[in-house]
Amino acid sequence: MHELPLVFFTVLGQSAAGLYLLAYASRKLGMLSENQLRHTNIAAFVIMIIALVIGGLHVGQPLRFFNMLLGVGRSPMSNEALLSGIFVAFGAATLLFTLLIKNKVLSELCNIATVIFGLAFVWSIPQVYNIATVANWFTVFTTLQMWMTLLVAGGALAILFGSQRLGAMAFLIGSIIIFATRAAYVSFLGETGPEISAEQAGFWSFQLVVLAVMLFVYPALLYRGRNSSVLLGLCALAVILAELSGRIAFYNLWQITM
């Protein structure tokens, strides 16, 4: 699948943005310690770097990334590239002022900027795919699923790194919205591309089954106080795999409208 690097780039990027957001909000609400926030920011930065490296495989040559920046302001893809770069830059600056230079004010400002540009980056992604020539993508469901990854995958990662209340809330809200809108999404695709959408049933089924299982697993683990990093890590991995499966289905829907 030629778009596989984009699958990882978008899902991991949205997951990292969600993790930054939920961790920072948890810290401000007194639900996360300074040390936990520091570890979470490191993890989120690593995830975003992995996303960029894998996404770069789709571009091919690294210098092509800079060519993409020439269309900033008029090209959604250029805007996405720019915002991803700014997102990573502020993430790096946050760690710089937290771990090395240790300036609390600058660290705080960079952390806020990281959250803001993470959200801007997530916003820019569906702008690339909401194009009239691809009827299967030209829908509000394209935008919706990108934001839901931020909630469910970002929420799962947030639970793993200590932001359990907001993480669980984000995962729950995102999962409910996914289940509530899936029938309408499939109905829409039944009109725009019935054959190609039918071929994605396996990917969507895997996604929904995993999310459904996690809706039972997370309450059981958190209610009983079983905060084993191994178990929560496996849960987060399962959720990310579910979102990757759903994103593969999304990219498989590509077809030019005649």
State the predicted function of each range.
Residues A17-L22, R27, G55, L95, ...:
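Hydrophobic alpha-helical segments of integral membrane proteins
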Residues M1-L4, M258:
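Short, strongly hydrophobic alpha-helical membrane anchors
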Residues G55-V59, V186-S187, G246, N252:
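Membrane-interface helix-loop junctions at the exits of transmembrane helices
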Residues E3, T10-L12, M31, R38, ...:
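Long, contiguous internal "core" modules enriched in hydrophobic/ aromatic residues
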Residues L241-M258:
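Juxtamembrane boundary at the C-terminal end of a transmembrane helix
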Residues S15, L19-I86, F90:
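Membrane helical hairpin/interfacial module
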Residues S26, G162, A249:
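Hydrophobic/aromatic-lined pockets within catalytic cores
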